[in-house]
From Swiss-Prot:
Residues 1-12 have a biased composition (Acidic residues). Disruption phenotype: No visible phenotype under normal growth conditions. The gene is ROPGEF1. Keywords: Cell membrane, Cytoplasm, Guanine-nucleotide releasing factor, Membrane, Phosphoprotein, Stress response. InterPro entries: PRONE_dom, RopGEF. Plants overexpressing ROPGEF1 or ROPGEF4 are relatively insensitive to ABA-induced stomatal closure and become severely wilted during drought stress. A similar phenotype is observed in plants expressing a constitutively active ARAC10/ROP11. It comes from Arabidopsis thaliana (Mouse-ear cress). Phosphorylated at Ser-460 and Ser-480 by PRK2. Residues 81-462 form the PRONE domain. This is Rop guanine nucleotide exchange factor 1. Residues 1-38 are annotated as: Disordered. Phosphorylation at Ser-460 and Ser-480 by PRK2 releases ROPGEF1 auto-inhibition, thereby activating ROPGEF1, which in turn activates ARAC11/ROP1.
């Protein structure tokens, strides 16, 4: 009996057993080998197949190929190589997101893209605009949008897991000795603020989910205008909604909301307002820690007086300084003007600080010389600049307190644009998104409360008119200002200054630029503040501004 060569053995094994790939999955090969050694009879019992090879005439030994036999449920696991389509689509989306981050949003690959920090900031901002951009109603988020927000935000935030800092740590040897090693932990700002932002995010999503069964509903603006005469449930729209024509109009029942529903709305509003304050605090802290970019400092004027203007500079350098009085004299009737004043104050602060830094360097050089008088003059200038910086910062703080939702200034936008720290970029963009979301929820709640208040007032007026009709009085005659005082006791109004509304009464005098006083005009002094962050005035006027 002749023996076969090794080459013939390889041919036989390749013909009988098929080709073998070294890159095959280990788990798959193990499962295949385990299943190939057993066969199952009709009753479910397994018996082993003889593993010894049998001899084939003229060909040598024949090794039987492994065969996958039926699998009994509960005893073995079925291996499926096919992945669901949704998993494949999520992987493709993740690849696309991270490709944009690595390329810096430059799809040409020429290296002209933005830095990684700005790319992540833009990605979080664009994701929030996609999911929450049309937050026009108090209703739960669609399941698709909610899943998209959680999935893609987790992809973007996973970058922070690799941002760590090294700290010394003491470890012990098994024999009793100790040695010092450097240990990694999350960076302190991310460790403190990122879990808090995730908690605020979850609370806002849960708040929207709670508006699944409400007593109010919404109608498109075109439908409201078209059916104005037919709909008996029409509720008056707020002044803000007349400007924001694309927003749907909230509607309430003819008798208004129930006390329980109104109380729930008020609680949600207070809760959202607290979330807004927390997000603002985190965002302000992160922006304050960012470095001031050089391009911003290069665009500043040479003097603080040029930044502020003549009027603000005179008030700021006066002997008696009151930030509240100065703000009352300024024109803060629009968002653009208020933001412009904030930009001027910030620019003046950094101009004076730059001068102090330069003079400190000159002072250090002049100490070695004999120019004592010049050094004394530089010290006086530094003290004066420090004094002006303190007053300007006090004025800016008072402005932010009066308008807590002031938009980002030019300095803030430059910090975001030129920031290189990825961790700070994640915290700033995430907190800004939470701030915007909390503000929009508060605005939507204010819309519903305003419509409910208007409905209650109309009901009270109707009841008053019906009461006069029951008593036999003509309401038109009773309240007519054209009748004589002798004909109706209601016709003569009480011309008393104290009868005016304390919040809407115009000032009796206004300060002019030259310091003189003149009588105020109601039409000029009573201007509506339409800025998005004026949270304090919304409760008084019932007008809720909108953040674009």
């Amino acid at each position: 009996m002749g023996s076969l060569s090794s080459e013939e053995d390889d041919e036989v094994s390749s013909e009988r057993c098929g080709s073998y790939s070294p890159s095959a999955d280990i788990s798959e090969s193990e499962s295949s080998s385990s299943f190939s050694c057993h066969r199952f009879d009709g009753e479910g019992a397994s018996s082993s197949i003889p593993s010894s090879p049998r001899v084939v005439a003229g060909r040598g030994f024949y090794f039987p190929a492994p065969v996958m036999l039926p699998v009994i449920g509960g005893k073995d696991v079925v291996w499926d190589d096919k992945q669901p389509d949704n998993d494949l689509s999520e992987i493709e989306m993740m690849k696309e997101r991270f490709a944009k981050l690595l390329l810096g949003e430059d799809m040409s690959g020429g290296g002209k893209g933005v830095c990684t920090a700005l790319a992540i900031s833009n990605a979080i901002t664009n994701l929030s605009a996609t999911v929450f951009g049309e937050l026009w109603r108090l209703e739960p988020l669609a399941p698709q949008k909610k899943a998209m927000w959680r999935r893609e935000l987790e992809w973007l935030l996973c970058v922070s897991d690799s941002i760590v800092e090294l700290i010394p740590s003491i470890q012990q040897f098994p024999g009793g000795g100790t040695y010092e090693i450097m240990e990694t932990r999350p960076r302190s700002d991310l460790y403190a603020n990122l879990p808090a932002l995730k908690k605020l995010d979850a609370m806002l999503i849960d708040m929207l989910d709670a508006f699944s069964d409400t007593e109010f509903w919404y109608t498109d603006r075109g439908i409201v205008l078209g059916d104005c005469d037919k709909d008996s449930y029409n509720s008056p729209a707020s002044v803000r909604q007349e400007d924001k024509w694309w927003l749907p109009c909230p509607k309430v029942p003819p008798n208004g909301l129930s006390e329980e529903a109104r109380k729930k709305l008020q609680q949600c509003r207070d809760f959202a307002n607290q979330i807004l304050k927390a997000a603002l605090a985190i965002n302000s802290g992160v922006l304050a820690e960012m470095e001031i970019p050089d391009p911003y400092l290069e665009t500043l004027p040479k003097s603080g007086k040029e930044c502020l203007g003549e009027i603000i500079y005179q008030y700021l350098t006066a002997n008696k300084f009151s930030p509240e009085c100065l703000l009352d004299c300024l024109d803060l009737s629009s968002e653009h003007q208020t933001l412009e004043i904030a930009n001027r104050i910030e620019a003046a602060v950094h101009v004076w600080r730059q001068k102090n830094g330069r003079r400190h360097k000159k002072q250090a050089k002049l100490k070695l010389s004999s120019w004592g008088g010049k050094v004394k003059g530089l010290v006086n200038d530094n003290e004066r600049n420090d004094f002006l910086v303190q007053r300007a910062e006090t004025l800016l703080q008072s402005l932010r307190i009066r308008f807590p939702g002031l938009p980002q200034t030019t300095l803030d936008m430059n910090k975001i644009q030129y920031n290189k720290d990825v961790g700070q970029s994640i915290l700033e963009s995430y907190s800004r998104v939470m701030e915007s979301m909390a503000f929009n929820i508060t605005a939507r709640i204010d819309d519903v409360l305003y419509v409910d208040d208007a409905m209650r007032r109309s009901i009270s007026v109707t009841e008053s008119l019906s009461l006069f009709s029951i008593n036999g009085l003509n309401p038109q005659k009773a309240f007519s200002v054209q009748s004589s005082p002798h004909g109706s006791p209601f016709a003569t109004p009480a011309l008393s200054v104290a009868s005016r509304s304390p919040r809407r009464a115009p000032p009796l005098y206004s300060v002019k630029r030259n310091g003189t006083r003149e009588k105020g005009i109601v039409g000029e002094t009573e201007k509506a503040w339409s800025y998005a962050g004026n949270l304090s005035s919304r409760r008084v006027t019932g007008v809720t501004p909108e953040r674009d």
